[in-house]
Amino acid sequence: VTYLDHAAVTPMRPEALAAVREALLVSGNPSSVHAAGRAARELLDVSRQRVARALGARPAEVVFTSGATEGAALAIRGALGAAPAGRREVVHTAVEHPCVRDLARTLAAGGVPVVEVPVDGRGLPDLAALDRAVGERTALVCAMLANNETGVLLPVPEVAALARRRGALLLCDAVQAAGKIPVDPGALGADLVLVTGQKFGGPRGAGALWIRPGVALAPVAGGHQERGRRAGTENLPGIAGLAAALEVAVARREEETARTAALRQRLESGLAEAVPGLRLNGAGAPRLPGIASLRFPDADGDALLIALDLEGICASAGAACTSGSTRPSHVLSAMGLSPAEARATLRFSLGWCSEAADVERALEAVPRLLRQVRAPTSAPLPR
């Protein structure tokens, strides 16, 4: 199998697998006071220290979650619940991940004021529109660091500075960015930052929410775990694997980023030569090293995706969380693409274990299969 869908889930690193196996043998509950519980608590504390160190944060600022979707819910609902009277509004960019955007729509249906800020053709937010949108009623601004479909990097420090001037908090979804580019909550100016393990070689179902000291979040569910900020017994194997993977990803970031960027460049340039009219979504904007969102002219993206899959090549039509939807990508639509253009787009994403052979296989297969899916399926009927 040629795997080119690392933005959905990247394979677990050996260090993470080893950490998960070891943690599975720790049977105690971290909340218990006996010896087995203390052993579990020690593993939890050490894992928290490792994640905090990788983020340049303090352990007390890290809350473990089941992933970015839960983390976003804790952050958004918690921020609204703890906001001062009169601050009930949520502002977010038009290209946020569904875990943020869909929750905002649910809140809007319940009466919470929600404002969506447009982006330009590159996928970058309109800062003038954002400046107009954020006001004295705004409790929370949501701006992702790197878009999951296009890889475009958003100007989070500028957004954070604007939010701070208006007295609003900033939630930054750093899920795609962590382990690939520096994620320093202090430098970003964020108040809340999301990461999740499966994007940098950790296990699925384990994530972390960084909370700036002094930021109050109302509890979303009853339970004393994670200093009262996230209820439920902690997933120790997942947390241990998350910590191990993030530590390794950060330590090897420069080396892996350079290699991945070179592979992406080879993929993009090779396909541009072989496919006349190919377009790169997000061109002209800073991007992650491993994501290429490519628009194939006059193509049925789903048909091309299926053809690739039948040859053992795994790619994506966009966010894994919205695969199977008949609606065009909200990200590409926000960037000004027509429904047909959005449906002609495939996302190829590379990761820590991608190799040159993966790219060369795609360069051979994509143009050939594109010609096949464009060809008529039957001969014309006689007149």
Regions found by a protein language model. Name each.
Residues V1-R383:
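Pyridoxal 5′-phosphate
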